Structures are given as structure tokens and as C-alpha cells.
UniProtKB/Swiss-Prot annotation:
Protein name per the record: Pyridoxal 5'-phosphate synthase subunit PdxS
Taxonomic lineage of the native organism: Archaea, Thermoproteota, Thermoprotei, Sulfolobales, Sulfolobaceae
Known EC number: 4.3.3.6
Gene that encodes it: pdxS
Catalysed reaction equations from the record: aldehydo-D-ribose 5-phosphate + D-glyceraldehyde 3-phosphate + L-glutamine = pyridoxal 5'-phosphate + L-glutamate + phosphate + 3 H2O + H(+)
Pathway note: Cofactor biosynthesis; pyridoxal 5'-phosphate biosynthesis
Length: 338
């Protein structure tokens, strides 16, 4: 069978099984008696730009769920999430409790890593280099430099090129997305307005990014040079974005996604995948809702399937949403980290 006759899912499954076999051999101690495998293991590259940018591609089409403990992580894995994001508090609780929001307890993150088989991500404060170094040492699969947590640096983000672990960053527009890419991010997510259960800001940010990419495509070279200066990014990055007609890295949607219909809407708008925060575990039906959101994200092109996903949940059990217009300017999380 030729490679191009295989589906992406079959290829992905093959590589996962290959990794499992390698781990079994390594754990059994047989690696010491198989010099060729030992040599291969020592030459495997990790942390390269290619590896860091490839990892998010394997999450495409899927849902990453915010969780705070092992039980929630297991629910997410059983529902079909492609990864989990570990926090100390869900965004809704961060918003309600106030104070300083920091990186989750490393012990909790470690427990989650030992309890599930899907990738584990965790958040750090914007600009907090050392929280990121701790998560890298812990062995998380991806770091989210997140506006949901209280920024450690109001002016600068982390230089992500210095790390071997991939990073995801939020963006509201193309300028923010390309600046984070230039800093070394491997994935972008729309900021939306986390912890509200209101998808309107995520919709707005996704549409802004798409619109600004379309404008870039029709610009002259001279105008693109001006735009690169405006965005404060290398011209080559602007040129590449115009050439491929999309962001150079994976772009997920996040912020206020609470229902299967929300999930399908963001995929329809062009998201490569989804981050779902408080919408799952601040609802009264997290098990069913997690499965329904995953189904809707995977089958967004088929309204009849999304309808069945929507029927799996009860609107009366959805999280209590927050009207964006009721928030004061200082209460908006999306304005952190421009």
C-alpha cells in the first residue's frame, strides 16, 4: 500500500504505535542488547523548530480541554480530547476569585501526566520565563503563555526560541499572531474572552485575523513592507503569510466556547481546532458535554451530526454565561499581552 493511500488518522495511529513499541523495548531493558536501536534512540532529535511546529499539527481538528485535576483529565481523555490544559483554577473561577493567578501546582500536573495517555499542556504567566523553565523540566508537552493568568511582565513575552518545548499564545488580530510567531510560538489561539461562556469575542477575533490575512494577500510588496513595520515583525513572515493565505502556524479558537454549536461555528470560521475552558467543567453535565463538543468539532461540516451532538446536552445545565458588555475595561483578560 502506498503512503498516499493511507488516511491521516492511519498514519497518526502508526506513529503512536511505533512510539509505544519503542517505549516498551526501552522500559524492558532490551535496548542495552540492541545496539542499533540504542544508537537510533540517541540520535532522535527533540526540541528542534521542525519538531516544535509539527507537534500542534497532530492536534488539528481536535479539542484541548482545560482541567484542574486527575478526574477531569480522565473525563477529557474518555471524551476524545486531543490534549488537556492544566490550570490551578478554571478561567471562570480565576475571573470570580480575583487576586493573582499563577501556574498550576507541579504536583497536580505530574499526577495528571501519570494518569492519562494524551498530551498534557499547562499555562504560565505572560513573561514569566522561570515558570516556563519549570514546566519544561517537568516534561509537559506544550506551554501556554496565557493572558488568563496574571502577567508577570506587562511589556514583554517570553523568548520561546530558547525552549525545547512548543508554546501556544493568544491573539486578537494578525499583528498579535505574527508577533507571537516571531517570538517562537508554535501555535496561536484566538483570545476570545475566557471564563465567560460567551463565544462572541472568539468569533470577532477569528474574523479579524481572517480578514487581515485577506487584505495582506491583495497588497503590493511596498504595502506589505509597511505592514511588517506596523506589526513589528520580519517582512519575510508577512510575505509567507500572504503566500500561503493563512497563519504560518496552527491556529486554534478559544474563549467562551460552551456548546457543540459554538464548537462547530468556530471550526466553520476556519479554526484548526479548539480550546474549551470553563464551558465543560463549569457545566452540570461535563461528561456528556465533553463528548458532544468533541463530536461537533470533528463533524462540523455535517449539521445533522452537530444537531445530534447538541441534543446530547441540556441548555439548562450549561455554565452561567457572562455578557461581555457587563465587564469593565479592567476586567477584560484579552487586553493582556499585546
Amino acid at each position: 500500500m502506498r503512503l498516499y493511500e493511507l488516511s491521516f488518522a492511519q498514519i497518526e495511529d502508526f506513529f503512536y504505535k511505533l512510539a509505544e513499541v519503542k517505549d516498551i523495548i526501552k522500559d524492558s531493558g532490551l535496548m542495552e542488547f540492541l545496539p542499533e536501536l540504542k544508537k537510533l534512540d540517541s540520535t532522535i532529535q527533540t526540541g528542534t523548530t521542525r519538531v516544535k511546529h509539527a507537534f500542534p499539527i497532530f492536534q488539528k481538528g481536535g479539542v484541548v480541554m482545560d482541567i484542574t485535576n486527575v478526574q477531569q483529565a480522565q473525563i477529557a481523555e474518555e471524551a476524545g480530547a486531543v490534549a488537556v490544559m492544566v490550570l490551578d483554577k478554571l478561567p471562570y473561577d480565576v475571573r470570580k476569585s480575583g487576586g493573582v493567578a499563577r501556574m498550576a501546582d507541579p504536583k497536580i500536573i505530574g499526577e495528571v501526566m501519570n494518569s492519562i495517555t494524551i498530551p498534557v499542556m499547562a499555562k504560565v504567566r505572560i513573561g514569566h520565563y522561570y515558570e516556563a523553565k519549570l514546566l519544561e523540566a517537568l516534561g509537559v508537552d506544550m506551554i501556554d503563555e496565557s493572558e488568563v493568568l496574571t502577567p508577570a511582565d506587562e511589556e514583554h513575552h517570553i523568548n520561546k526560541w530558547e525552549f525545547s518545548v512548543p508554546f501556544v499564545n493568544g491573539a486578537r488580530n494578525l499583528g498579535e499572531a505574527l508577533r507571537r510567531t516571531a517570538e517562537g510560538a508554535s501555535m496561536i489561539r484566538t483570545k476570545g474572552e475566557a471564563g465567560t461562556g460567551n463565544v462572541s469575542e472568539a468569533v470577532k477575533h477569528m474574523k479579524i485575523i481572517n480578514s487581515e490575512i485577506r487584505s495582506l494577500i491583495s497588497m503590493s510588496e511596498e504595502d506589505r513592507v509597511k505592514k511588517a513595520r506596523e506589526y513589528q515583525v520580519p517582512y519575510q513572515l508577512v510575505e509567507l503569510t500572504a503566500k500561503i493565505k493563512r497563519l504560518p502556524i496552527v491556529n486554534f479558537a478559544a474563549g467562551g466556547i460552551a456548546t457543540p454549536a459554538d464548537a462547530a461555528l468556530m471550526m466553520w470560521l476556519g479554526a484548526d481546532g479548539l480550546f474549551v475552558g470553563s464551558g465543560i467543567f463549569k457545566s452540570q453535565d461535563p461528561d456528556e458535554r465533553a463528548k458532544a463538543v468533541v463530536l461537533a468539532a470533528a463533524c462540523w461540516e455535517y449539521p445533522e451530526i452537530v444537531l445530534e451532538a447538541q441534543k446530547m446536552i441540556s441548555e439548562q445545565k450549561s455554565m452561567m454565561g457572562i455578557d461581555i458588555k457587563s465587564l469593565k475595561p479592567e476586567e477584560l483578560l484579552q487586553v493582556r499581552g499585546l
